[in-house]
Amino acid sequence: KEIIIPIYKKNILKWYKISKRIDDDISSVFMAINDRIEKNIIKEIKIVCGGLAETPKIAEKAQKFLLNKIFNEENINEAKKIIKKEFDPIDDMRASKNYRTKISQNLLERFLNENNKIKSTLY
């Protein structure tokens, strides 16, 4: 089964790969996000996560929560909590469960902040 990330006009699409080595290494965490924010409202959002389950999966609950919500710190923090509950990553030689969870939360916040032109140092 494939995961299709649609690209819409005025949307921002970014992907992040976190691994020990950038080249030729399996990701510890991968995230692709596509969204459109209009007048501070999240009008469209797609979030795909890798490294948090057996195969890459859509973060359906986080997407559903963020859709048509005001872009603010409170909603970002709630979406991070949802991501944590939505996935149950494994511990392996690439990364621990806690590391994968924290990185996925940080990447979501980083994307949303950068998309709204707020500088971020989160990984």
What residue ranges belong to the model's regions?
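C-terminal structural segment of proteins
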Residues: 1-123
